[in-house]
A protein has these predicted regions:
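Short, structured interface segments
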Residues: 68, 72-101
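Hydrophobic beta-strand-centered segment that forms part of the acyl-chain substrate-binding groove
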Residues: 89-93, 149-150, 173
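Conserved beta-strand and immediately adjacent loop positions that scaffold enzyme active sites
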Residues: 34
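N-terminal intrinsically disordered, low-complexity, charge/repeat-rich segments that act as generic
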Residues: 16, 51-57, 69-73
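Acidic, gly/ser/pro-rich intrinsically disordered tails
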Residues: 1-14, 21-31, 40-49, 58-62, ...
Length: 238
């Protein structure tokens, strides 16, 4: 196993389980289950995030709705056929459960490569944002494709990045509801999952970005990524 790839993608979340575990798949005789967890923001709002957990962890910790968990893992993607079309699915793959929470209940750091041209735009409230899709290498020659959103001056910086450039980011995972119109009478409310970036580094700077150090630092500061959509934390790594 490539331990360097294991460091490219680190997540910590702390929250309340909302749903019963549902069987997802089996690998070498070990079953994996899906559930959702609500992670509270400082504002009181919550991000409802999908988790994938092994049956061993579920049995050891008696994971069920209402239980609070502190989970370390990775943010992973996979393709799923939905109505005959391939859809990118995202989940927090839990590697370890901790007894104690961290001050920051929602913390992610990633290192990967730009795989689509960033899309820069201004919202109706005059906020600058940029959508970025990052390919993060995983062991066994796999990759996870993680949608991210940058704000303010990070968004302006992101729009200058090219496909193939290396990038490192830190922030939080957020859920966001949106409406999609399939026909005049068919409008559905869907949920998107993405990384809200509070810090980013690109090109040579990304090579010197210590994932472990940044992950520990982000977890030690309460609410560090809460205001990622403002200018307060829009700084790049040096």
């Amino acid at each position: 196993m490539n331990t360097l790839n294991e460091k490219n993608n680190k997540v910590f979340i702390s929250g309340e389980i909302l749903t019963e575990a549902e069987f997802s798949h089996e690998v070498y005789g070990e079953g994996f289950y899906e559930m959702t967890v609500m992670v509270k923001r400082l504002s009181g709002q919550g991000d409802i995030l999908p988790l994938t957990v092994s049956e061993r962890l579920i049995e050891d910790r008696n994971l069920k709705p209402g239980v609070f968990i502190n989970a370390l893992g990775q943010f992973r993607s996979y393709n799923k056929l939905v109505d005959g079309k391939s859809k990118l699915m995202l989940t927090v793959f839990v590697r370890e459960l901790l007894d104690e929470p961290r001050k920051n209940p929602n913390n992610i750091v990633l290192s990967g490569y730009i795989c689509k041209p960033p899309v820069y735009r201004t919202t109706p409230f005059n906020r600058e944002i940029a959508d970025i899709l990052i390919a993060v290498n995983r062991s066994y020659n796999k990759s996870d494709y993680i949608p991210c959103i940058a704000w303010g001056r990070n968004a302006r910086f992101a729009k200058t990045l090219s496909v193939g450039e290396k990038i490192a980011v830190a922030g939080r995972i957020q859920s966001r509801e949106y409406q999609k119109k399939f026909s005049e009478d068919d409008i559905k409310t869907l949920t998107a999952y993405e990384v809200s970036i509070s810090k980013l580094a690109a090109a040579d700077n990304a090579d010197y970005f210590d994932i472990d150090e940044e992950f520990d630092m982000m977890g030690a500061v309460s609410g560090r990524t809460e205001d990622a959509d403002g200018e307060r934390y829009q700084n790049k790594f040096n």
